[in-house]
């Protein structure tokens, strides 16, 4: 992501008939410490805005590649100065609402935890959060274990890690709520859970800024 535009980055989260406009830093700064490329984002306001028309596939505005072998291949993608993330149609990816580890810096490991860990049992059904297309289905022994990456038509990509089994294949189109894997304990983990990430052009966004997990809604 190029910082030439990030200072004026405006993200709108469209949900339930209104948009929440995020003009910069609270979305990113509250995640601190974050990737050094994002530390210069301007201070923000959160406001309601009228619903607006959106593209059928806003992700086409962002991504210029389709890499099926890496979770994080992005180097040059740029987000428009104003971009609407349509959160309508969200499906809770797990049967559980229990977040066991939150997004943020982990002093004990000296690294960022760039997603949420949600309690699941091995074999629990994991579903796609939105409509989209499967980009990656792989195994990462030192990290995600069995994982799936889905690019959604709203511009987000979601990552589902530590699965016991993947139920989808690369280039498969999926609907929100459609099973994509089974919960598990593969990869670098200390117990059965789902590691869930939300990213825009490769940059992690705290899923709890987007979704209300206790309510299983946006």
Feature annotation, model-predicted:
Residues 80-85, 98-127:
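Short glycine/threonine/proline-enriched tight-turn/helix- or strand-capping micro-motif at secondary-structure
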Residues 100, 119, 133-135, 164, ...:
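Conserved positions in beta-strands of structured domains
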Residues 106-108, 123-125, 139-141, 185-188, ...:
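Short polar/acidic secondary-structure junctions
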Residues 103, 122, 138, 164-167, ...:
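A generic structural motif
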Residues 146-152, 170-218:
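Conserved, short, structured surface segments that act as functional micro-motifs
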Residues 97-99, 124-134, 174-177:
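Generic structural motif
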Residues 2-103, 218:
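Polar/charged, compositionally biased leader and regulatory segments
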Residues 111-114, 128-167, 197:
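Zn2+-dependent peptidoglycan hydrolase active-site motif and core
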């Amino acid at each position: 992501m190029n910082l030439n535009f990030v200072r004026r980055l405006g993200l709108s989260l469209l949900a339930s008939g209104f948009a929440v406009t995020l003009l910069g830093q609270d979305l990113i700064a509250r995640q601190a410490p974050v990737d050094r490329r994002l530390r210069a984002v301007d201070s923000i306001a959160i406001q309601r805005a009228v619903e607006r028309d959106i593209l059928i596939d806003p992700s086409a505005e962002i991504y210029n590649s389709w890499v099926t072998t890496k979770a994080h291949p992005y180097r040059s993608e740029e987000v428009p100065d104003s971009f609407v993330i349509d959160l309508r149609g969200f499906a809770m990816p797990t049967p559980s609402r229990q977040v066991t580890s939150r997004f943020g810096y982990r002093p004990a490991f000296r690294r960022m935890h760039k997603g949420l860990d949600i309690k699941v049992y091995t074999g629990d059904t994991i579903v796609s959060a939105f409509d989209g297309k499967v980009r990656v289905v792989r195994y990462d022994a030192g990290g995600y274990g069995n994982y799936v990456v889905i690019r959604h038509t709203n511009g987000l990509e979601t990552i589902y890690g530590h699965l016991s089994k993947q139920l989808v294949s690369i280039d498969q189109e999926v609907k929100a709520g459609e099973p994509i894997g089974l919960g598990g304990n593969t990869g670098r983990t200390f117990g059965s859970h789902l590691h869930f990430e939300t990213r825009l052009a490769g940059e992690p966004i705290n899923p709890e800024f987007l979704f209300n997990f206790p309510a299983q809604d946006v």
